[in-house]
Amino acid sequence: KYVSRETTGQKEWFMHEDLLKRHLELVIEANKTTNITRISSWEDGMVLHVQDSLLGLDALNACPEGRYADIGTGAGYPGIPLAIETGRPTLLVDSVQKKVQILDGFIEELGLENVSTYAGRIEDLGREQAGQFAAISARALSKLSILLELSSPLLKMGGRLICFKALVEQDELNHARVVGKQVGMELVDDQTYELDGYSRRILSYEKVAKPKLKLPRRTGLAQKKPL
């Protein structure tokens, strides 16, 4: 089965409509007892979770072959839809143990053998699995500069960070450029999409050099004392 969407004037087709919809059903059901998303209706979920996640498909396919991590994954967006569509080995990362337990249930129910989870801080993952990832995604998680610092130690050389954003101020972009030079990351792609009246932006940063400072820094410093 295929699911189609109209976003950029082109019709695109996805092969796994049943799995994508079943994931959303599971999210809405789980959300009745545990707050894993602010989106509670089917219609909003299809647009703001499923279709929004799939906007990142081209960016993920442009990354090198290898493991993919979705950091701050929450209900599994964009990680689960992108794992379903690409078949990449995927790690869903969240610091909230309860959310990760729910994600484990989703993965089992959906039969996703290419997907696993990590409950913990991104900095800890960076220490444990440095340079292990070809691609990382982050959706509405933090400022670009913080995401660059957190993702750089996880990425192998040539690997990419894919940032899902709504509005991005020029100041944030400029600061990210400065921090990128410190952590070995460079902007290589910047796409804007219209999705059901919402403006969405997907920025891809590539790891092009070793960081000039020791990363990851102590847990929490990226947010408390940003570069």
Where are these regions (language model features)?
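Class I SAM-dependent transferase core
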Residues: 2, 11-69, 98-118
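Short alpha-helix immediately C-terminal to the canonical SAM-binding loop
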Residues: 99-101, 169, 173
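SAM/dcSAM-binding transferase cores
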Residues: 174-227
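Conserved SAM/SAH cofactor-binding pocket of Class I
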Residues: 54-140, 148-149
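Short "lid" loop at the C-terminus of a central beta-strand within the Rossmann-like core
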Residues: 123, 166-170, 193
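A short hydrophobic/small-residue beta-strand
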Residues: 90, 161-162
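A short SAM/SAH-binding and catalytic strip from SAM-dependent methyltransferases
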Residues: 134-147, 153, 162, 167
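Helix-to-beta-strand junctions that scaffold the AdoMet/dcAdoMet cofactor pocket
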Residues: 155-157
